[in-house]
């Protein structure tokens, strides 16, 4: 299932159970990749927000893994033997995000610490929803 359909199904499952908070699995690398995707493919500086409120559904989406790198998440999944679900989206693996992931790997060889610098820029740049006040709520 593709991301938008999956998120819609998760939001509906929450509402069906009388819940209103959804923890999404976006991590550090997702934020860096999203910023670069927006910059390169849309010509804008932007990234998803750490906390998003969907007022039409009264659902709060949180991203508690934002400060955790993808490799750390993968290591924890393996170490704790957590079950995983295969992505059945037909575009999986052949996406713009995958292109950006490969680009970052290449750039990191010549510019060590690039991901850290980009993530730092996300935190310092006045992106909506990334300010300290919003994050403390």
What label would you give each PLM region?
Residues 72-74, 87:
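Short glycine-rich, acidic/polar surface loops and turns
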Residues 1-72, 118, 135:
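Active-site adenylate/phosphate-handling loop in enzymes that bind or generate adenylated species
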Residues 82-137:
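The feature marks non-catalytic terminal segments
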């Amino acid at each position: 299932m593709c991301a938008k359909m999956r998120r819609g199904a998760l939001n509906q499952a929450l509402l069906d159970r009388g819940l209103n908070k959804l923890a999404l699995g976006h991590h550090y690398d997702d934020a860096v990749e999203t910023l670069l995707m927006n910059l390169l493919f849309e010509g804008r500086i932007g990234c998803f927000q750490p906390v998003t409120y969907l007022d039409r559904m009264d659902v709060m989406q949180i991203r508690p893994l934002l400060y955790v790198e993808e490799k750390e998440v993968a290591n924890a999944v393996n170490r704790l033997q957590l079950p995983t679900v295969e992505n059945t989206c037909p575009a999986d693996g052949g996406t713009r995000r995958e292109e950006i992931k490969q680009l970052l790997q290449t750039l990191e060889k010549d510019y060590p610490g690039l991901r850290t610098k980009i993530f730092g820029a996300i935190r310092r740049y006045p992106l909506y929803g990334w300010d300290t006040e919003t994050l403390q709520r």
